[in-house]
């Protein structure tokens, strides 16, 4: 492990165009449940009697707007979550002008909360909301502080700005993410199993020097990586920052 940390530190210190690609594992230490792991959010919301895929779908929003709103308020608004050391480390490297930014599969908004400026949120963010009817914009604090569920302009359902099942990923976001990957000298994957498509397929566009994967479980890209660390990333980053 120590040799891996030394290698990781050397690569990070010698890189000036790092792109980060993050998944659910990054936010677990902040109290955000991993969607797909055993005991994760999908397991938990399955207890509601409807499939998680349906509850997080465009169809459910259209079939039962009130039910969809209530589900979002009950299950998705992580009020007390704060960035952890991994989010802070990524933001610090961006401030130090070593990083091109971060691409994330997460919807919790914690990268932005940590101070990262160049964040491509592939699946949207819970930091923004909008009316499903008239598209008036709302912030997360609007929704939480005022317990807003319906638009004060037209009465429509206020939905989070996330990509639901049955909706397409935002193409400008995909283009920005591809640009970050294609121009990176080092790509660091953190807390992602790299199996959810099409987002995970972006990794195949990396042509730089070093692919680093830090994840508890194996990924389909492990054999292509310069360095693979199967460990808790909070522990890895803490150790890295004390090296």
Curated annotation (Swiss-Prot):
Residues the record marks as active site: 123
Protein function: NAD-dependent protein deacetylase which modulates the activities of several enzymes which are inactive in their acetylated form.
Main location: cytoplasm
Subcellular location: Cytoplasm
Coiled coil region boundaries: none
Alphabetical list of HAMAP family matching this protein: Sirtuin_ClassU (MF_01968)
Lineage of origin: Bacteria, Bacillati, Bacillota, Bacilli, Bacillales
TM region(s), chain numbering: none
Entry-linked Gene3D superfamilies: SIR2/SIRT2 'Small Domain, TPP-binding domain
Catalytic activity: N(6)-acetyl-L-lysyl-[protein] + NAD(+) + H2O = 2''-O-acetyl-ADP-D-ribose + nicotinamide + L-lysyl-[protein]
Keywords, comma-separated and alphabetical: Cytoplasm, Metal-binding, NAD, Transferase, Zinc
Residues noted as binding nicotinamide in the record, renumbered to the chain: 35, 107-108
Protein name: NAD-dependent protein deacetylase
Required cofactor names: Zn(2+)
Gene Ontology terms: cellular component: cytoplasm
Binding residue positions for Zn(2+): 131, 134, 151, 154
Residues annotated as binding NAD(+): 24, 35-36, 105, 107-108, 123, 192-193, 215, 232
Domain Deacetylase sirtuin-type: start-end pairs: 1-243
Catalytic class of the enzyme: transferase
């Amino acid at each position: 492990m120590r040799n891996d940390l030394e290698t990781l530190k050397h690569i990070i210190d010698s890189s000036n165009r790092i792109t980060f690609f993050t998944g659910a594992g990054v936010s677990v230490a902040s109290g955000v449940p991993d969607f797909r792991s055993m005991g994760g959010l999908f397991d938990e919301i399955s207890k509601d009697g409807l499939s998680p895929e349906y509850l997080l779908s465009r169809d459910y929003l259209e079939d039962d707007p009130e039910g969809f709103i209530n589900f979002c308020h009950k299950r998705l608004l992580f009020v007390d979550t704060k960035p952890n050391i991994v989010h802070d480390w990524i933001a610090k490297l961006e401030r130090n002008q070593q990083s091109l930014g971060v691409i994330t599969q997460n919807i919790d908004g914690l990268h932005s909360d940590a101070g990262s400026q160049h964040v491509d949120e592939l699946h949207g963010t819970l930091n923004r909301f909008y009316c499903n009817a008239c598209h008036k914009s709302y912030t997360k604090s609007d929704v939480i502080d005022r317990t807003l569920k319906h638009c004060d302009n037209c009465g429509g359902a206020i939905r989070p700005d996330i990509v639901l099942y049955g909706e397409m990923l935002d193409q400008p976001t995909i283009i920005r993410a591809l640009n970050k990957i294609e121009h990176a000298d080092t790509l660091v994957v953190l807390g992602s199993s790299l199996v959810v498509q099409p987002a995970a397929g972006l990794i195949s566009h990396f042509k730089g020097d070093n692919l680093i994967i830090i994840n508890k479980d194996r990924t389909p890209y492990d054999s292509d990586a310069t360095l693979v660390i199967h460990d808790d990333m909070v522990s890895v980053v803490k150790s890295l920052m004390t090296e």
